[in-house]
Design a protein with these regions (language model features):
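N-terminal glycine-rich FAD/FM-binding segment characteristic of electron-transfer flavoproteins
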Residues: 1-228
Length: 228
């Protein structure tokens, strides 16, 4: 089992397409900011692509303290091989406690592959996230028919509580990952509220360009064209 004391921070994989950030990025960074404030840690965006440093600071306006920019022509278009390698290498190097990924077509491909390589769990298509157990209990009061008076809750629990619909939406399941790190979830687009953009925070956002290893030999697929 990993030493949990080594894992700090809430990370968001920030998806870009043709050099433009996705609205899901801003939703997830905004939600990550809330979680990080409860954990007392930083929010870090992880941005992969080719010549994408110029769009990174916008993520700071929604709550990112820093953005790790991995720039390479080999990352211009999404390929599972390249992106999974770089994301996992960054996670193994910097050890975030939480990693959020948008449940887009790309995120649904990338998330499970990274979780398998990192030997951790993944909650798919989450629609609600909590750290604070008291807030989670309030969420249950508002959204479920459970008799909470008969339930026992550990109010000292600081695991990420990831809630997602199951059985066609007839059941809401809350999942935790208490034994492995990072705690990973893909998050359904459009369900998290985007914070108002703050230009001062965007200006203050730190841009980091970490060293990483990626060669053409790491990539088994070739992108012939991208159709919109």
């Amino acid at each position: 089992m990993a030493d949990f004391n080594e894992y700090k921070g809430v990370w968001v994989f920030c998806e870009q397409r043709q050099g433009a950030l996705m609205s899901t990025d801003f939703e997830l960074v905004s939600e990550a900011r809330k979680l990080a404030d409860e954990l007392g840690c930083e929010v870090t965006g992880l941005l992969l692509g080719d010549n994408v440093e110029g769009i990174a600071k916008e993520l700071g306006g929604y709550g990112a303290d820093k953005v790790m920019v991995c720039d390479s022509p080999l990352l211009k278009d999404y390929t599972t091989d390249a992106y999974a390698k770089v994301v996992c290498d960054m996670v193994n190097e910097y050890k975030p406690e939480v990693l959020l990924i948008g449940a887009t077509n790309i995120g649904r491909d990338l998330g499970p592959r990274c979780a398998a390589r990192l030997h951790t769990g993944l909650t798919a298509d989450a629609t609600h996230l909590d750290i604070d157990t008291a807030k989670y209990v309030e969420f249950l009061k508002e959204s479920s028919t459970i008799d909470l008076s008969k339930q026992k809750f550990d109010y000292e629990d600081r695991n990420l509580k990831m809630t997602r619909p199951a059985f066609g939406g007839h059941l809401m399941a809350t999942i935790i990952c208490p034994r492995f790190r990072p705690q990973m979830s893909t998050v359904r687009p459009g369900v998290m509220k985007k914070a108002p953009f703050d230009q001062a925070k965007a200006d203050a956002c730190q841009i980091v360009k970490p060293a990483f290893s990626l060669t053409a030999d790491d990539i088994k697929t070739e992108v012939l064209s991208v159709e919109k």
